[in-house]
Structure formats: C-alpha cells, structure tokens
C-alpha cells in the first residue's frame, strides 16, 4: 500500500478486548458507514451517562462519512457537543452490515449481552437503546443505567430469544439457491451456527437455523 490516509479513528484508546470495532460498508448513497463498539463486557464499567448514549463519545455509535472522510451536509444534528460524523447511537456491538437490495436500506446485526441479539434497520438520528433498552439481560448484577432525558429508543426489527452472537451479515439476492433468495444470512459466534432470516416489507416472516 502507498499513500495511506486515515479517515476515521475509533478514539479513545482503551485496554478492552471486546467490541472495539464493528461493521463498515459503503451505502447506496456512496457514503461510508462505520460502526464502533461500546467495548464494555460488564455494564457497570459505564460512567453515569453510558458511553453508547453519550453523543460526545465515539463508542457505541454508527458514523456516516463522505469517501474522503469529510462529513456529509445532510447528516443528522445531535448538537454542538456531538462527535463529528455521528449518524446513530445506542449501539453495543454492530459487527454485521449489509444492504437490502430490494429497498436500498442498510441493515445491521448486533450482539446483546445475555441473549438480546438483534437485527436492525439503520436510520438517521436513531437511538437503538443500549444499554437503557435491551431485549436481553445484563452481565452486571442489579445494573440499572441512568435515564437519558428525552431519549426515544428504536426497537429492533428482530431479536433472538437464545444467544446467537451474530457476526457478519449478508443479504442474498442470487439465483443459485432460490429458496434463500431475498434473505439475510447471519453467522453466529456462540455455536458456530448459520441462520437464514426472511423478510418482507421490513418485517421478519421467518427465521431458521441452517446449521
């Protein structure tokens, strides 16, 4: 490689081993979308205002950039304290991102803690809730995050009742496997599993574990 240029840094540096980065994808609009993890394995390591809910912190967010690293003029406005490029927040660990080629919408998969793994549709300005809203449990006993004034949380399109640990995400639009056409393929870390999730009109109509 030559003329390498840094467009984005997932600052600040931390010693955590979990959920440092996340999915990266170019959207149909030509913009670059980058997910960052919250990095906490135990929720009590959050400050009073959890990292993923703090618009001045890069952790637990999704960012939207122009290909040259500049900030699009039509990005949502989170206020003067917000980190640059912020597009959505309330993310724990969004490792998979893909495009539904039928609609052009970006979907992302997200790790829960104790269960609570999710599929979401990315929307400008949306707050996906972590850690204040989750379909799973917490690893920290008796943990209760501080309320975030005025926050409106977006529910997931789909969540698994048992742990899947979704990593990666692909929308299959090919013809070689017609029964899989227009489905999301989700690999799971917890058991080395593979799931097929079929949707219509942005709603899940079936979910099956392939192996």
Range-by-range predicted roles:
Residues 8-11, 28, 91, 101:
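Short, flexible loop/turn elements at secondary-structure junctions
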């Amino acid at each position: 490689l030559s003329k390498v240029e840094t467009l984005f840094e997932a600052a600040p540096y931390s010693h955590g081993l979990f959920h440092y980065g996340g999915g990266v994808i170019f959207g149909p609009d030509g913009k670059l979308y980058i997910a960052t993890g919250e990095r906490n394995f135990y929720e009590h390591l959050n400050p009073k205002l959890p990292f993923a809910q703090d618009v001045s912190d890069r952790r637990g967010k999704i960012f939207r950039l122009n290909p040259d690293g500049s900030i699009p003029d039509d990005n949502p406005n989170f206020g003067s304290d917000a980190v640059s490029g912020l597009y959505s927040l309330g993310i724990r660990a969004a490792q998979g991102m893909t495009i539904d080629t039928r609609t052009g919408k970006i979907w992302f998969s997200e790790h829960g803690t104790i269960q609570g793994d999710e599929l979401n549709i990315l929307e400008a300005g949306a707050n996906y809730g972590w850690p204040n809203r989750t379909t799973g449990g917490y690893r920290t006993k008796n943990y209760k995050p501080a309320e975030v004034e005025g926050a409106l949380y977006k529910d997931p399109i789909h969540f698994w009742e048992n742990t899947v640990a979704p990593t990666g995400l692909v929308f299959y639009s090919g013809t070689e496997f017609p029964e899989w056409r227009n489905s999301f393929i989700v690999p799971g870390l917890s058991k080395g599993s593979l799931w097929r999730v079929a949707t219509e009109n942005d709603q899940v109509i079936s979910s099956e574990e392939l192996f």
